[in-house]
Amino acid sequence: MIEFDYSLDYKNIQFKPNDKRYRIGRGEQGVLLVRPYTNDICKHWRFKTHNEAVISSQKIFDMYLEYRIKKDFVGMDMCRKFLEMGFTRARRYANHKDGRTVSYTHLRAHETQF
């Protein structure tokens, strides 16, 4: 697999459909860097409550289908990454009420022991 290319100047690149500079990478790599897709998808990305996650995932999947009709591989892959990232975060909220995997109170108590 070709790794995601972090050396590109993402602040100044506006990717186009099927842009040859785009690399899939592994999992969620580069999900917040690839503009304009990140900006377009991110405004619909919610996961804190069950209802938010359902609405968000349906909207992003609809965007995926729109990109598919346009044969826009970059848009499709970015939607996939956001859905994957949302699934991971939603699972975290399901397992931890505040979404944190570490109790900061516990860490502070532990730090004072040293």
Regions found by a protein language model. Name each.
Residues 105-114:
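Conserved small/polar residues in nucleotide/adenosyl-binding loops
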Residues 78-100:
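Short, charge-rich amphipathic alpha-helical segments embedded
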Residues 4-47:
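Short, charge-rich, low-complexity alpha-helical interaction segments
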